[in-house]
A protein has these predicted regions:
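An N-terminal boundary/leader segment
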Residues: 1-60, 293, 300-302
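Acyltransferase
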Residues: 30-35, 64-67, 258-259, 283-310, ...
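Conserved small-residue hinge/capping positions at short loops/turns
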Residues: 75-102, 128-131, 135, 298, ...
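Short helix-loop capping/hinge segments that flank enzyme active sites or metal/cofactor-binding pockets
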Residues: 81-102, 264-275, 326-399
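DPxDG-like acidic metal-binding loop motif
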Residues: 96-109, 175-177
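Short glycine/serine-rich loop segments
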Residues: 114-244
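A short helix-breaking turn/cap at a secondary-structure junction
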Residues: 203-294, 352-358
């Protein structure tokens, strides 16, 4: 792999709001914007391997429809918020366009009969779906290397990983293929690749964005979220996809402040908590330096920096690697070669179990198999109490630590946000 990457060799791509506003002012057509995105993807994807599918023909049809409708939509201010904006979708989110593969041989030919709620809402907001992105298989991984389609490469430096599991979404946006993309985050899968590719990414509050149409990994942890070059570009995408969905029983009913409103919140008076654990001696020196610079920047802007303690945070990784595989072993049991996924050939007379075993062995990669085995182990009768129930107790203690940090009760820190490294 070459050392230099696409992102360092090309000019910074247009930001989401700039694209949308240029279309609204009539300076560019949707066709021009989408054509540019398709050209970037077609010429660059061989180097980054960020995309599993490019929808060139379908995107151009959609662009023509939007351009034709432009004259009937009234003044620029009445245009849908993402009108004409190219968007990339992580390939574990269902789309009627193309296939939904989860970067796995198990689903390499699967075509969804419906769009995920988040995808439908993007289209309703005027977005143009131009591609689906590579990922660690079934969203299990943190480097972008565990994919049936091959590893994703960081566009800033092809010798480095982009992070994962939303590796393709992050690499695609950083390389300028589209101004924003959807990913999914179970244990850092939006935030970590966004950090490694120099982007802004958010894992929304659980239930804020519908999971209907997201292929399940660990259902109590999975969330869909956006990534883009800056918070101002993430906000309109999050606004478009958030909201209650009766098709998702975990979807929140409560109203939430819009992202654009939060962007205008004054820094002066904000209370930002810095956990003692974030200043760990285990941090890389460059991470510690950037953290302290960020703290100083917020303090200079008028924020109040509050030292807080999250005493059970160190148990988070251990709890995650018990809870997530346990849920995955249950969720992925449906891929048996009968109901879903790849079906291996069997000879006449072989038992049904042979077809199950062969289908799953051929269909799942090594990382997915490892996690299924781990999850099955911690749920087994001899270890359920010692591992799984202990991990659930640890999660409750971690949640309590954060609840106390955000509490406005007398004597509590009462912070508005917690400031800590993403990786």
């Amino acid at each position: 792999m070459s050392g230099a990457g696409d992102a360092s060799q090309s000019p910074r791509p247009d930001r989401l709001l700039a694209i949308r506003n240029s279309i609204a002012r009539g300076e560019r057509s949707v066709r021009e914007v989408v054509t540019d995105a398709i050209e970037r993807m077609s010429s660059g994807n061989a180097r980054t391997n960020a995309l599993t599918q490019i929808f060139a023909d379908e995107a151009m049809v959609r662009a023509a429809e939007l351009d034709a409708a432009r004259s009937s939509l009234g003044p620029a201010g009445t245009l849908p918020p993402l009108f004409g904006v190219p968007m990339i979708i992580k390939d574990n989110i269902c789309t009627r366009l193309g296939r939904t593969t989860c970067a796995s041989r198990m689903l390499e030919n699967y075509r969804s009969p419906f769009d995920a709620t988040c995808v439908r809402r993007l289209v309703e907001a005027g977005a143009v779906i131009v591609a689906k992105s590579n990922l660690d298989e079934f969203a299990m991984g943190g480097s972008g290397e565990h994919s049936a389609f091959g590893p994703t490469r960081n566009p800033w430096d092809h010798s480095r990983v982009p992070g994962g599991s939303s590796s393709g979404s992050a690499a695609a946006v950083a390389a300028g293929y589209a101004p924003a993309a959807l990913g999914s985050d179970t244990g850092g899968s939006i935030r970590q690749p966004a950090a490694l590719c120099g982007l802004t990414g958010i894992k929304p509050t659980y239930g804020r964005v519908s999971r209907l149409g997201l292929v399940a990994f660990a259902s109590s942890l999975d969330q869909v979220g956006p990534m883009a070059h800056a918070a101002a570009d993430v906000a309109p995408v999050l606004e478009a996809i958030m909201g209650h969905d009766p098709g998702d029983s975990t979807s929140l009913d409560a109203d939430a402040r819009q992202g654009s409103e939060l962007l205008t919140t004054p820094i002066v008076g904000l209370r930002l908590g810095v956990p003692s654990q974030a200043r760990s001696s285990a941090n890389h020196a460059s991470v510690s330096r950037v953290l302290e610079q960020t703290i100083a920047t917020f303090r200079a802007a008028g924020a109040t920096i509050v030292d807080i303690d999250l005493p059970h945070a160190d148990a988070g990784i251990a709890a995650y690697y018990i809870i997530a595989p346990a849920e995955a072993s249950s969720n992925l049991a449906r891929y048996d070669g009968v109901r879903f996924g790849r079906r291996a050939a069997v000879t006449q007379g072989e038992p049904l179990e042979a077809m199950y075993t062969r289908s799953r062995t051929e269909g799942f990669g090594s990382e997915v198999q490892r996690r299924i085995m781990l999850g099955t182990h911690v749920l087994s009768s001899g270890y359920y109490d010692a591992y799984y129930l202990t991990a659930l107790r640890a999660r409750r203690l971690i949640k309590r630590d954060f609840d106390r940090a955000f509490s406005r009760d007398p004597g509590m820190p009462g912070v508005h946000a917690v400031l800590m490294p993403a990786t």
